């Protein structure tokens, strides 16, 4: 049975205009977006990429709403600069654009959206969501989203109940559309609202409400004006704050968050204590005046339920509440706070515990407040994972009853655990974490070793346990039968005895039929939960079965009658005394076992992916086979690609110029190379890099093939590294020249892989020693002193001869080498320039060795062709040509600065007023290594470069470095960097980074001194990096 049914037995919503009776709150929210906006950009989440927009995606693939046409829909990945696509799309449009995104992604949107300069408006539909790396759990993180909203200055609205999610979404859309801000955020419980199935009973305002609002709201209205008009026209009461409880309350709790608000509201409902509750619906802007009006005059204590990321610092909500009371003279009220982190597990008992810690006399009846709850536990790979959904579907058919379902996956416990919690009640209630159920069904005994199942069962409740081992021949009056024969942990038996929980064993082994076992588990549930007889159990099961099922009600009844007699056993209560007396023996040096978790640690939205795809092995082929495939391309699905082994788009370019720029007698070979890209369609931007797919020296490859005994014309088929089902066909010569790094440095795992192939025992022993800790010194000598290549190793170990098919898997592939582009395409539309240094050294044998890629490129003759690709970069010019540019670099790190200066030249030629350009460069000697020196001087004379600060470290007795040149111009750089909002770039090796960063801090410190303020210089540097005004391109 598909996972989709196990998590939602009612199926997907077919369209956005007519929602089903049951669904998730996220589906309800999505319908508002789909019906009221013209464009939607949805960003993927982790684990289940379309978690927050799967309905939007499905609806957009269909015809959509006939009367208005479907909105534009685009699904995107989360990355730096998120938001640029909708920002560009909305340019020139006056409609509101919807962005659907998980809360953890909002920091990536800040730079894109905080400076919207056109008329576009944005509604961010955000599910509070994050991932806790420490615990491996999925969390409801409101803090990250609220922090981003504050930086964007967007208003935020959050539903305080699942019964108002559509209305709040529509309100957020109205605020985004009509308020004087460029956007608003609908922030909701992303975790529970996407994974809880419940009745969709909300009465939604008519679609024309937005049109009506446009007629009565002044342009660029204030947030509260839009809110008030929305409530007035719809008749709703979606105010900033909602008060519940006693009007003479002495203690008032403040909550923010969808589930939190519902649970506290349910907890204090009907309580006679002097308790009040304020749910925050609008956290931003926090209206302090309105908040104070909701605080009863009798209030003595306010308790803020605040979320923080670290669990210690005061929450955002606490600071707002304290400020509101201070500004309105309510300082006699004490303010306390209960702080919780995003991974906090909310449940009725948790709420009771929190309230009781502030009001000891507080009591409430959790069972009556939260309906009847049940828990189903199973392995996430079980064929019976859908049992709970079948039960929920049957419960939903009862008149006058509501049912809610919340499913969870823990990919770690028991190698994959599934839990379904479902509640039936006379009114819709929240599903959090059931902590006191009268019945749990456990489908897999092994789960009891990983989770404290009994802890969430009420005293004198029941547990139905499915055993995959036969029960019928066991002595059920013996403790040993349960522990040794059925594998039930002793700790579990002790727990059920302590709480007097009834235990029923379902004999899953003897049932011997998975489909019938499912029927019987359902029947046991109906019997234990509601006391139904066989006839009524059959009736409930029959109602929930698919109409096409090949089974009759009579056969179900007949099977259940026998099953209850033969396959269900109740553990005798008389045995509980023996359970209580069990003494779990602990070995002498064994530590006290850790307590089992009570609740599932929700680590994913999907089952554990425990299947391993079988990867086909490389194989050799005859030329005739290749000829056959090329002759019948359609039949064999042959594709002809430039480099199918590479995931990026590639281009073939020609060398136009290749010249050395350092003297021939100088020990560093640095060269400038230009490629002709005419007709290739290749484009590049400032700051990007060119990936060179270099080849091995063909004559050296042929030498190796002859030595190894390989035929260069043989054909080898290698699985594509991105899609193992695709086979790439290469000749042996092609593979070793273009694909395999045969002259590269082998890693440790290569030596390990050679051991099985060594036929000589002495060589085998040497290889084995190399990969042990004792052989680390020799291995390092092989790699970093002798610089042995793959080819060298096969010479050193002549008995090691893997086959061709094995060679292509154990030799690492050639990697593309990336070089910063030294040209602007606006100035050189059909060229791309690079500045490269040839890496060389002399090994222990006296051989001159070279870096594979740099040497290959330096030897290219004019007219040579090679494969290249473009790599994006974080290095960009400031948004305005007027903003200054400060560049510092060493050696070939000057390459991107040539591109920047050319771009500034182009800007000036187009009539733009350009800002100051400072260039700081460094090398050892001016005569040998003043790279592009003549160009820099010419650009300075032309008024493009403002100042050149050249530091040639060895041309004078004292060493001079670029940071020294920077410090000589602190006044000018302060004006350029701080006053005129310039950008600072550092390119080249990593070692100058601390010194250059210190020089930049000196600039910031000078500004702070002039303004008479104190600045955290480290934080200021980080802010510059975040704003892309301090950019490091180092290697």
UniProtKB/Swiss-Prot annotation:
The keyword Electron transport belongs to this UniProt entry's keyword annotation: yes
Pathway participation: Sulfur metabolism; hydrogen sulfide biosynthesis; hydrogen sulfide from sulfite (NADPH route): step 1/1
Catalytic activity from the UniProt record: hydrogen sulfide + 3 NADP(+) + 3 H2O = sulfite + 3 NADPH + 4 H(+)
Binding-site positions, FAD: 684-695, 814-824
UniProt-listed Enzyme Commission number(s): 1.8.1.2
Cofactors: FAD; FMN
Alphabetic keyword roster: Electron transport, FAD, Flavoprotein, FMN, NADP, Oxidoreductase, Transport
CC per GO annotation: cytoplasm; cytosol; sulfite reductase complex (NADPH)
Matches recorded under PANTHER family: NITRIC OXIDE SYNTHASE-RELATED (PTHR19384), SULFITE REDUCTASE [NADPH] FLAVOPROTEIN COMPONENT (PTHR19384:SF109)
Protein name: Sulfite reductase [NADPH] flavoprotein component
The species this protein was found in: Saccharomyces cerevisiae (strain ATCC 204508 / S288c) (Baker's yeast)
Lineage, broadest ranks: Eukaryota, Fungi, Dikarya, Ascomycota, Saccharomycotina
């Amino acid at each position: 049975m598909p996972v989709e049914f196990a998590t939602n037995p009612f199926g997907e919503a077919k369209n956005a205009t007519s929602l089903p009776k049951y669904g998730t709150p996220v589906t309800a929210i999505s319908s508002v977006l789909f019906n009221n906006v013209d464009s939607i950009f949805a960003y993927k989440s982790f684990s289940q990429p379309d978690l927050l927009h799967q309905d939007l995606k499905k609806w957009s693939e269909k015809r959509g709403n006939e009367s208005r046409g479907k909105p534009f829909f685009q699904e995107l990945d989360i990355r730096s600069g998120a938001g640029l696509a909708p920002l560009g799309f909305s340019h020139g449009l006056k409609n509101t654009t919807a962005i659907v995104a998980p809360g953890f992604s909002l920091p990536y949107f800040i730079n894109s959206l905080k400076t919207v300069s056109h008329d576009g408006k944005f509604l961010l539909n955000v599910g509070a969501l994050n991932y806790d790396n420490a615990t491996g759990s999925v969390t409801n993180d409101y803090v990250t989203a609220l922090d981003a909203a504050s930086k964007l200055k967007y208003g935020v609205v959050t539903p305080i109940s699942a019964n108002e999610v559509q209305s709040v979404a529509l309100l957020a859309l109205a605020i985004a559309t009509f308020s004087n801000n460029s956007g608003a955020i609908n922030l909701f419980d992303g975790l529970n609202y996407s994974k809880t199935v419940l009745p969709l009973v909300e009465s939604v305002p008519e679609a024309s409400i937005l049109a009506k609002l446009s007629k009565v709201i002044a342009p660029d209205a204030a947030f509260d004006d839009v809110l008030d008009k929305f409530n007035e026209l719809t008749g709703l009461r979606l105010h900033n704050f909602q008060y519940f409880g006693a009007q003479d309350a002495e203690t008032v709790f403040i909550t923010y968050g969808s589930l939190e608000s519902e649970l506290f509201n349910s907890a204090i409902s009907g309580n006679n204590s002097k308790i009040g509750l304020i749910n925050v619906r609008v956290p931003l802007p926090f209206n302090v005046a309105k908040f104070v009006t909701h605080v009863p005059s009798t209030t003595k204590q306010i308790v803020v339920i605040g979320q923080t990321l670290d669990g210690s610092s005061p929450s955002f909500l606490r600071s707002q509440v304290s400020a509101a009371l201070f500004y309105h003279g309510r300082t006699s009220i004490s303010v306390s706070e209960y702080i919780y982190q995003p991974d906090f597990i909310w449940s009725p008992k948790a709420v009771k515990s929190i309230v009781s810690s502030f009001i000891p006399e507080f009591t409430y009846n959790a069972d009556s407040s939260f309906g009847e709850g049940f828990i189903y536990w199973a392995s996430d790979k079980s064929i019976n994972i859908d049992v709970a959904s079948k039960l929920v579907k049957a419960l939903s058919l009862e008149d006058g009853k509501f049912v809610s379902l919340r499913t969870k996956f823990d990919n770690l416990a028991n190698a994959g655990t599934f839990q379904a919690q479902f509640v039936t009640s006379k009114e819709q209630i929240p599903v959090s974490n059931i902590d006191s159920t009268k019945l749990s069904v456990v489908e897999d005994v092994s789960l009891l070793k990983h989770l404290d199942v009994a802890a969430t069962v009420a005293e004198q409740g029941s547990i139905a346990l499915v055993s995959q081992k036969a029960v019928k021949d066991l002595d059920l009056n013996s403790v040993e039968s349960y522990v040794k024969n059925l594998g039930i942990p002793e700790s579990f038996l002790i727990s059920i005895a302590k709480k007097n929980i009834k235990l029923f064993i379902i004999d899953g082994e003897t049932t011997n039929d998975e489909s019938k076992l499912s029927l019987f588990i359902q029947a046991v549930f109906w019997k234990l939960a509601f006391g139904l007889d066989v006839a009524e159990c059959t009736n409930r099961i029959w109602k929930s079965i698919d109409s096409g099922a090949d089974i009759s009600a009579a056969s179900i009844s007949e099977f259940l009658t026998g099953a209850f007699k033969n396959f269900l056993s109740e553990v005798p209560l008389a045995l509980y005394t023996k359970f209580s007396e069990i003494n779990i023996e602990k070995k002498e040096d064994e530590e006290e076992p850790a307590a089992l978790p009570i609740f599932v640690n929700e680590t994913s939205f999907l089952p554990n992916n425990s299947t391993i795809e079988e990867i086909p092995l490389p194989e050799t082929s005859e030329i005739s086979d290749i000829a056959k495939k090329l002759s019948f391309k359609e039949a064999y699905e042959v594709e002809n690609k430039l480099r199918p082994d590479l995931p990026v788009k590639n281009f073939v370019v020609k060398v136009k110029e290749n010249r050395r720029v350092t003297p021939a007698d100088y020990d560093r070979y640095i060269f400038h190379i230009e490629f002709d890209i005419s007709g290739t369609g290749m484009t590049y931007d400032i700051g990007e890099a060119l990936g060179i797919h270099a080849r091995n020296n063909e004559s050296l490859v042929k030498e190796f093939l002859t030595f190894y005994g390989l035929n260069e014309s043989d054909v080898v088929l290698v699985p594509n590294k991105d899609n193992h089902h695709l086979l790439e066909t290469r000749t042996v010569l092609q593979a070793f020249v273009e694909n395999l790094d045969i002259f590269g440095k082998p890693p440790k795992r290569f030596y390990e892989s050679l051991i099985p192939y060594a036929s000589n025992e002495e060589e085998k022993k040497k290889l084995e020693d190399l990969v042990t800790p004792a052989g680390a010194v020799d291995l390092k000598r092989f790699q970093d002193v002798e610089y042995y290549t793959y080819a060298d190793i096969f010479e050193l170990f002549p008995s090691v001869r893997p086959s061709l098919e094995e060679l292509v898997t154990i030799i690492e592939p050639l990697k593309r080498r990336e070089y910063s582009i030294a040209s602007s395409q606006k100035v050189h539309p059909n060229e791309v320039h690079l500045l490269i240094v040839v890496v060389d050294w002399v090994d222990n044998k006296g051989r001159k060795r070279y870096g594979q890629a740099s040497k290959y490129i330096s030897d290219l003759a004019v007219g040579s062709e090679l494969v290249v690709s473009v790599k994006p970069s974080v290095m960009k010019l400031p948004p305005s040509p007027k903003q200054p540019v400060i560049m510092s670099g060493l050696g070939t790190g000057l390459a991107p600065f040539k591109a920047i200066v050319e771009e500034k030249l182009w800007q000036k030629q187009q009539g733009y007023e350009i800002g100051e350009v400072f260039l700081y460069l460094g090398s050892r000697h001016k005569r040998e290594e003043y790279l592009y020196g003549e160009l820099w001087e010419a650009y300075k004379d032309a008024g493009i470069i403002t100042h050149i600060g050249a530091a040639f470290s060895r041309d004078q007795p004292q060493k001079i470095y670029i940071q020294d040149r920077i410090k000589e111009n602190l006044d000018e750089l302060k004006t350029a960097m701080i006053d005129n909002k310039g950008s600072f770039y550092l390119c080249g090796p990593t070692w100058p980074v601390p010194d250059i960063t210190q020089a930049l801090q000196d600039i910031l410190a000078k500004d702070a001194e002039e303004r008479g303020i104190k600045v955290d210089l480290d934080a200021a540097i980080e802010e510059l990096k975040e704003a892309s005004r301090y950019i490091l391109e180092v290697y």
